[in-house]
Amino acid sequence: MTYADIILPVPLDGLFTYSVPAPMVGQVRFGVRVLVPFGPKITHVGVVARVHGKAPEGIAVRDLLRVLDTEPVVTATQYRLWQWMADYYMAPIGDVLKAALPAGLKAEEGYKPRTELYVRLRPEFGSARGLHVALDMIGR
């Protein structure tokens, strides 16, 4: 069985161990983002810190839900910096993760660009009177 230690954006010390389902074994590696269950109804996006084969003793381990990246979003150098920051400032590494990752990488779906919606009037609303009728229909 394969296990992964995950950095989660929660104010608790340490890493959280999850089991890696067989279909995901080739995808889970250091630095990729994963979606994991945390508590009864919450999911979090975390970063894989280590992949290993040692099961934690006396703890029920849950499965990873999904691998979000094909390439790592964190390098080994960045991770060492995060560890140093957590030690120096006596902060959980999850808080360092929250501060270090850009907002687009914290979401499950990744970066979502802002979009604008354009509306075009049908030809029958092309006149000034038709425009007023259309505006009245949508309630201004």
State where each predicted segment sits:
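Accessory, non-ATPase domains that flank or precede helicase/AAA+ motor cores in DNA-metabolism machines
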Residues: 1-140
